[in-house]
Amino acid sequence: MKGSASESPSASVAEATTTDVQVTPTALLQLDREQIRKAVEVISNRSKSKKNNNELLLSGSENLFLMVILWKIPEKELRVKVPLPHSILSESSDVCLFTKDEFDSPEQTEGFYKKLLKKHGVNTISQIIPFKTLKTEYKAYEAKLRLLGSFEVFITDARIRRHLPSHIGRHFYQRKKVPVSVNLLAKNLSKEINRCITGTVLNISKRGSCSTIRIGHTGMETEHIVDNILAVSEMLSEKLPEKWQSVKLLFLKTEKSVSLPIFSSFVTSQDENAVSLRSLRKQELKKRKRENAKLKKESKMLRKKSKKATSLLTQSGLASSAPAKSPGAQKKKTNKAHKKQKVTEECEEAIPQLVPIGETPDKENVKMQENITGKTPKSKSDPSTPKGKKRKALLATETPEASAPGTSGKKQKKDVQEFRKPEASSFSTPRKSGKKASNTPRDKKTKAAHSN
């Protein structure tokens, strides 16, 4: 019983470790060491063949870089110092150190730091440049390019590192020779400097998904280069936001060579039955598309419902407003029709009857006018007082008594009275014509005398 109890925890631990490896795969499990060795041998053989053809031009060794391609562009820049098991510096490589201005003159500061390095036993640094000399002597563009080409590695004091980008220029960042910060006040200074020189810097920018890391040179042994690549890949699996799952592709190359593939997340050599990240991402994309389609359908339904509601409201508003306005409109139309009929009847029947001067109309004539027009005759207004707009009066035709047979045989023209559309408020009686036939007894006598 005790033996079984003692064996059970170990078995559970083993199961837990296997499940952890399956869930979160590390770089050592995913990478193939033989594939990396083959790629390193191909690149080193190519560089050696170039040296044999051009011995004078290519005397030194070429730098090797590991190109990392991520699935996603990171939101923040990542800069990590990666310690390597084997130094990436060659025997002929030079190291430059940028220091703080401890004294007024740059010569005094240079001598001070040389003594400090000798005290700690550091012999790898070839030149010391104070910050004051960097600002004055290397201000020109050509001087910066000369400085960049003369050294392989640049180290700077951590106290002045934030001031360097404005003075060294963009070419240091393009050539991947960014100065590495060192704490010159550390107690074990030799160990600190050797760690910076032998190691490399992991720079992953947020501008793109591709970045390169220096991992050695062609003069190194193949096994040493393979060890450095594995160390960098382990650091990637720890420092990246999604660990090793964020790595898409890994390539090995020099500055001017073709990139050779080392790792691909689509097909891995160790886990053949494992689900690839590509399929997982396709599933995620399908889910997102389904969710987006559902949201679109819901939005369309809501829009249709809102349109229906607005149309119903408009229809109900029109239906409620139509019966309220219809009786008034009908009344107005009927009133206008009645008024038009009255105006036409008055225009046709408002021609006044001629009455001889001096004779007042009798009651019978008044009754006759009332029967014809349906209104009592109004009293004449004074011509001096204008009532509204003036109306043109028709010339009344002469009576058969006034027209003498011997005066003229021509037919007398009948002037037609023009009526304007009367206003609804009041109707003025038309004025009589200016030329009137006189029917007085005196005139009759004169006419009879002429006829005789």
UniProtKB/Swiss-Prot annotation:
InterPro entries: eL8/uL1-like, Ribosomal_uL1-like, Ribosomal_uL1/biogenesis, Ribosomal_uL1_3-a/b-sand. The modification Phosphoserine is found at S433. It holds the Pfam family Ribosomal_L1. GO terms for biological process: regulation of apoptotic process; regulation of cellular senescence; regulation of protein localization. Keywords: Acetylation, Coiled coil, Isopeptide bond, Nucleus, Phosphoprotein, Ubl conjugation. The keyword Coiled coil applies. Interacts with ING1. Interacts with KPNA7 and KPNA2. This is Ribosomal L1 domain-containing protein 1. It comes from Mus musculus. The gene is Rsl1d1.
